[in-house]
Amino acid sequence: MTICLASTDREIQEIRDLQEVNLKDNIPLENRLSDGFLTAKYELDFLREMNDLTPAIIAKEKGVLVGYALATNRSMLTQHPLLNDLGAQINKIPFGGKLIGDYDYLVVGQLCVAKEVRGRGLAKDLYTHFRANYERHYAFAVTDVDRDNLASLTTHLKVGFQVVSVLQYGGSNWHVVVWDWRKSQK
């Protein structure tokens, strides 16, 4: 397994392909609870623009992309409806004695691991590289997890994220989770 930054157009296309398979609408209802799902659909041009600013962390096995963690800086939040809703909401949440919006933070735009490699610790490995690549520039990572996506919430909590708020927007209920990189443990 190789974990690195996404750098080619082919890798961006592979991210988009893996995303498509794992979107909520493409996962049978009976599998969503155990398998998890993705909520936001990103088009190729948006993924390219996001990757130009803050490259995604990707995992490849035998040359095939099997997982990714999208990094999204604040300038991209207004470019997508769900990210815009997230940004508008999270900036007002108290955290560490200030509002989240008062910090330099990085949004996890999406985390996805291919079904065939789940259960091998890849989400943790992706996030370890994510932190190593971005913690010098940001106080923490923040994202939201659909309240119906218990598989994703469990994964995020195991990595070190903590729930800081529960919000409703975009027609769903969300856990807002923060991984505070100012703490010394890695």
Predicted segments, located by residue:
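A short beta-loop-alpha structural element at the N-terminal edge
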Residues: 1-29
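Conserved GNAT-fold acetyl-CoA-binding loop/helix
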Residues: 24-44
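Conserved acetyl-CoA-binding loop-helix of GNAT-fold acetyltransferases
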Residues: 110-113, 119-132, 154, 158
